[in-house]
Amino acid sequence: MSRRSRERAALKLGKVHMYGVSFGGFLNVGYAVKYSNNLSSRMTQSGTSSSPLAISEMMRLRREAPGWVTETMDRCEAEGDLENPEYVKAADYLYRQHLCRLDPLPPDIRWFPSQTKFRDVNLVYRLMWGVHEFYPTGNSKYWDVTNQLGQVGCPTLVTCGRFDEITPKNSETLNRGIRGSRLHIFENCSHTPILEDPVAFFRVHRDFLQEVS
């Protein structure tokens, strides 16, 4: 987080508007609780203040999936058989429900389990989160700054998709903890509202920036 402050100072940017999505949303929150005086505003999409909360909600989504998804994932993980085609199919099902619901997938989506190999997952992602979104084993799984949200003092917009893997409960927690925060949930969207409903996505963010600028 301090690196971002040094970069901002070196570039002589003054206060900035900060946007973070997904894991960038986690970082966005972590930065704001320490350095909100450097921010004109911040926008967090599909972020959280608590990895344990995010993981708990993702495990709930797994449990609520069709039985074959839950059974296959639990069995293959217990056996260490993550490259099993049945496991890949089950993980893909969750991605299609909670990461991008468009069918067919847009050409720039290249990170579904059926499109890659778990063994080829980026090392940083693997260490910090895991081999895929719904199997969090990385070293950031205990990160939690929920009790510091009251320190955020800049205008804040919190957004997510109704069917987001980082569920609305995460965004609602952020919204409650940050004074004057605004919350928008994109209906019929999951983790990628910029692709699933771009008109609404840009309208919400444009209106927020116009108001706080």
Residue ranges and their predicted role:
Residues M18-G20, S46:
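Short beta-strand immediately N-terminal to the catalytic nucleophile in serine-hydrolase-like folds
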Residues I178-S213:
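Catalytic active-site module of serine/aspartate enzymes centered on a nucleophile-bearing elbow/loop
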Residues V29-V33, F202:
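Short, hydrophobic alpha-helix immediately C-terminal to the catalytic nucleophile
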Residues M1-V16:
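Conserved acidic catalytic loop of the alpha/beta-hydrolase fold
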Residues R63-E64, W68-C154:
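Alpha/beta-hydrolase
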Residues V33, L39-P85:
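Flexible "cap/lid" loop of the alpha/beta hydrolase fold
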Residues N139-C189:
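Conserved loop-alpha-helix segment in the C-terminal half of the alpha/beta-hydrolase fold
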Residues G20-G24, N28:
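Gly/Ala-rich beta-loop-alpha elbow adjacent to hydrolase catalytic centers
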